[in-house]
Amino acid sequence: MWQCGSCGYMWDGEEAPDKCPKCGAAKEKFTKLEDKAADIVERSRFTNDLHMQLYVVLEQVIAVAEDGIDDNLDPNCVKIFKRAAEKAEILQQSIKAELQGHMKKGKWG
């Protein structure tokens, strides 16, 4: 596994690419990750993907809740929809914070 020193792009392969697919940096800008670091990246990919999938589902929760708030059938319904939207937003922010922590610890790529 290789990482671009210019933009951080991770490349899976035995050799670095001729140029970075993201930023176009030359092959020389890539550094090979040590096995332990590469293992951490590989291990974290599944969990990071789950976080991103959950984030998308929470976007749907917010959209449904907003529709329910707009529908305004009765106060109890609106209360539930508002609570759902608030909780979904908190969870989304928590996911962003968690992923940022993963990036700082090399658990991303």
What are these regions (language model features)?
Residues 23-35:
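Short Cys/His-rich micro-motifs in 6-15 aa windows
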Residues 8-14:
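Short, flexible, mixed-charge glycine/proline-rich loop motifs
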